């Protein structure tokens, strides 16, 4: 199955010896080193000012879709204070000759959340160049909690820290722990609905809806970047249109972002896009469609019509974008093989339905049908099991798991769900490579991981995450931009930096510009690559030579410097 994702990049000639196409015109900067004018780059020499760091002699990509320039970058007090020819008047001089220098990458759709307390450096993300990470996606966030749940859990320790109730408590825990990357979070609609309405398929009453809006307003006031929906999951899928619109009007009031994991990403994907757009139209909220895809072979032809729906909305004046990770396999929970109607209620209630002959028959038929639509058991990877004795299933495809268990496909799925109390991670290989290229190359697209922070060490190193958690951005730049040349480097970098910064309303990140926060990468364009695989995911990317987070030299020659972690809450 590894051949479905060729993640090894082929070495190329130094990027300075190749031309970069911009607007159909070859940029001579890559060939001659000629300095081009840019609105973000000053010209001339500056040797009087002393800097904390000078990144010298690199090809500077500002994050704008403009030709690169050969220049130095001066950093002082965590900010970019000069972009020019600067000499060596500094405490830390970094030679970036033959290297790309660009803004730190912004992962607008991640699931890092509480993992950042276990791996505060942000190991798997910072090694692929991510300096800002946005969590709380797909309708789930590590907050808020009801008064009752907070009282029940506040005296327990979570990763060694007191429990929190709202976003401000979670942010405080991150600050006290210190973090190596910048972090912000959506608030999950599913969590709000769970608190107020519960986990069953019922409409919110007017009073409940008023309470949901009040909770959302509070989280946004405390710093949430927006509201995320996970309409393929419970309990978010049980919300009604009126509920969504009322909540999104609160989002629009704050000029925050509305992100949606749509109700369907396969047979009814076009209808799901239309629903997402209609909710944005009726509420006035800015829309981010999460990990846009067409799953299963019988839906691969739908990508052009999907994009037409999105671009028609954008042409009508709607603020709409989408994001995507550069892999043809998705990642989710094994409970996706249970139909939504059977996922109501608590885990105990759901597990009981696996024992009831009538409901088990319904679930079995749905599960086997979905296995077939995904391409068979050889297209389903069990990414993480946690129960003692189940380690042998981690990293194995479903057909391999069947051989280990001595059971058929359904009985193996059922056993894993029961023994793991529904908590099983999986990956499904259900997407087409050509569609992936089309989506990534769209002007409204941004690059994401859709993954969490991991580390090869400790508990997190025992899991088998999707390789995107270690290599989405390096895979995109190395495989698709350098090797396959489907867009110029400045456009690619903008999708990873300035475009998500604009969507998040970040006023001082996403560009290399005087006065901006010094989140800066030095990249070896010849070697940048994702080396993580589905079988061996815990491998750091190659080619990210240096990473600066708020001016602090966090990675040097690809290794953690031991510095005090400098990430902030955005």
Q: Which residue ranges define each predicted feature?
A:
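Active-site neighborhoods of metal-dependent hydrolases
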Residues: 174, 179-182, 186-206, 212-233, ...
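Histidine-rich, glycine-flanked metal-binding segment
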Residues: 24, 39-53, 59-104, 119, ...
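N-terminal secretory signal peptides
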Residues: 1-14, 38-39
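Acidic, glycine-enriched loop/beta-strand segments at the rims
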Residues: 52, 61-72, 424-430, 435-436, ...
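C-terminal cap of metal-dependent C-N hydrolases
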Residues: 356, 438-444, 449-450, 454, ...
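Divalent metal-binding pocket/active-site signature
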Residues: 221-276
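N-terminal export leaders
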Residues: 12-28
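Metal-associated gating/positioning segment near the N- to mid-region
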Residues: 93-165
């Amino acid at each position: 199955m590894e051949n479905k994702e060729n993640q090894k990049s082929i070495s190329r000639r130094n990027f300075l010896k190749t031309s970069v196409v911009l607007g159909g015109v070859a940029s001579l900067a890559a060939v001659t080193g000629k300095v081009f004018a840019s609105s973000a780059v000053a010209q001339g020499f500056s040797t009087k000012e002393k800097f904390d760091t000078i990144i010298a002699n690199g090809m500077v990509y500002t994050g704008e879709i403009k030709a690169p320039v050969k220049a130095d970058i001066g950093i002082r007090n965590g900010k970019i204070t000069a972009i020019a020819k600067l000499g060596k008047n500094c405490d830390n001089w970094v030679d970036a000759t033959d290297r790309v220098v660009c803004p730190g990458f912004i992962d607008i759709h991640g699931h890092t959340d509480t993992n950042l307390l276990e791996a505060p450096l942000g190991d798997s993300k910072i090694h692929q160049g991510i300096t800002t990470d946005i969590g709380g996606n797909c309708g789930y966030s590590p907050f808020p909690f009801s008064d009752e749940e907070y009282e029940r859990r506040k005296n327990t320790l979570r990763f060694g820290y007191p429990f929190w109730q709202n976003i401000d408590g979670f942010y405080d825990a991150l600050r006290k722990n210190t973090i190596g990357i910048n972090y912000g979070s959506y608030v999950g609609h599913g969590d709000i609905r769970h608190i107020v309405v519960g986990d069953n398929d019922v409409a919110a009453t007017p009073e409940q809806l008023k309470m949901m809006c009040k909770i959302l307003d509070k989280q946004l006031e405390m710093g949430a970047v927006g509201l995320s929906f996970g309409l393929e999951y419970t309990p978010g899928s049980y919300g009604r249109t009126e509920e969504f619109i009322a909540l999104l009007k609160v989002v629009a009031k704050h000029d925050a972002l509305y992100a949606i994991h749509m109700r369907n990403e396969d047979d009814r994907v076009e209808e799901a896009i239309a629903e997402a757009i209609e909710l944005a139209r009726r509420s006035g909220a800015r829309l981010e469609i999460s990990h846009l895809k067409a799953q299963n072979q019988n839906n691969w032809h739908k990508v052009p019509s999907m994009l037409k729906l999105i671009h028609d909305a954008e042409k009508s004046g709607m603020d709409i974008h989408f994001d995507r990770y550069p892999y043809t396999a998705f990642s989710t929970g094994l409970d996706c093989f249970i139909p939504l109607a059977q996922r109501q209620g608590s885990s105990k209630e759901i597990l009981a339905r696996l024992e009831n002959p009538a409901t088990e028959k319904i679930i079995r038929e749905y599960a086997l049908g979905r296995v077939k639509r995904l391409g068979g058991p050889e297209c389903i990877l069990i990414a993480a099991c946690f129960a003692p004795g189940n380690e042998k299933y981690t990293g194995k495809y479903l057909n391999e798991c069947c051989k280990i268990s001595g059971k058929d496909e359904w009985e193996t799925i059922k056993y894993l769900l029961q023994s793991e109390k529904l908590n099983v991670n999986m990956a499904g290989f259900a997407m087409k490579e050509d569609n992936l290229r089309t989506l990534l190359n769209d002007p409204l697209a941004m690059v994401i991981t859709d993954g969490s922070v991991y580390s090869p060490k400790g508990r997190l190193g025992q899991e088998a995450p999707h390789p995107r958690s270690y290599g989405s951005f390096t895979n995109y730049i190395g495989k698709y931009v350098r090797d396959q040349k489907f867009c110029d480097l400045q456009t690619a970098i903008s999708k990873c930096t300035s475009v998500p910064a604009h969507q998040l309303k970040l006023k001082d990140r996403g560009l290399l510009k005087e006065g901006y926060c010094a989140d800066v990468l030095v990249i070896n364009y010849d070697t940048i690559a994702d080396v993580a695989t589905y079988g061996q995911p815990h491998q750091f990317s190659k080619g990210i030579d240096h990473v600066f987070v708020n001016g602090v030299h966090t990675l040097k020659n690809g290794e953690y410097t031991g510095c005090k972690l400098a990430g902030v809450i955005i």
